[in-house]
Amino acid sequence: MVHYKSVFYKSAALVCGFVLAGASVAIASSEAAAKTRSKMSEFKRRAVSSPSGGRLSVLDGSFTALANDASFFEANPAGSANMTHSELTFAHTVGFNNSHAETLSYVGQSGNWGYGASMRMFFPESGFNFSPSTGPVCTPASNPIKKLGGLGIVNFSRRFGGLSIGANLKAGFRDAQGLTHLSLGTDVGLQWVGNVAKFFSSAEPNMYVGLSATNLGFTVKLPGSPFVLCRATGEQCCKTCSGRCTGVGTCCNGEKPCCKDCDCNCPCQDEATPGSPHATDTMLRAGFAYRPLSWFLFSVGVATRVNVSNLQVDHSGSALPMRLG
């Protein structure tokens, strides 16, 4: 016998999920399109990051609360202790501008302990290319930045009843058109799971709360030949963009006129000397999820990016960039 009412509810919930996912992707696309100026200058503070997994990509900040599959690593490191099963996964993730990442992850449990490891490589649209440079050194800011890199994560967490505490140790490297950085850092997280106002029978909890701080660490710019290449082919771009362009000539290898705001992607914009560390941009995340019925899940999350060096300089309490998901 077919229970049409149950099928209808499940179908409606699925449609709502697709609508919300589409809205999240649309918002992310508009944000990416709006931030096309001086992108290379921000890379010195970015940790190597390669989120993977369908649930993390769609739920974003709210997955900080759930964190209940192998994509939990960069959402909430406390998730491994509250999982009820082990997972071995391989994920192929395609991002914007056809960039992609390959991820191999394992998570397991032993008593009240959770543990896991994840290895990731990410590539530009050109594919598996391990050449010294991933593309032209100096390009228009409207062009995507080609990135090549790898990331390794080791996770441990401990459960105390419904509360778990976890941490990741992570290391990675990234080459972004000649701007090469090595990143070392850690993630910390807190998760609570339990049963509250539950109207269905299941061994799984129906309420989740999560907090995490990811990418606590530093990046170091590595010396290399791409900067010699940068000075040779991108000299005009770097010099005119670092000052105030008079409008004479072009930059970005002649592809786009130069302006005083430096509308270029050029490694020379990173003024740091090789070997000098920079504090990474830390992501602060919070999430809440509630499942009153077997076919319905409500979740909400928030994430914001901060940098320790900025907080030390600016005490004005200016608004931090924040997103809901």
Swiss-Prot record:
<protein>
    <recommendedName>
        <fullName>UPF0164 protein TP_0856</fullName>
    </recommendedName>
</protein>
<dbReference type="Pfam" id="PF03687">
    <property type="entry name" value="UPF0164"/>
</dbReference>
<feature type="signal peptide">
    <location>
        <begin position="1"/>
        <end position="28"/>
    </location>
</feature>
<keyword id="KW-0732">Signal</keyword>
<comment type="similarity">
    <text>Belongs to the UPF0164 family.</text>
</comment>
<dbReference type="InterPro" id="IPR005362">
    <property type="entry name" value="UPF0164"/>
</dbReference>
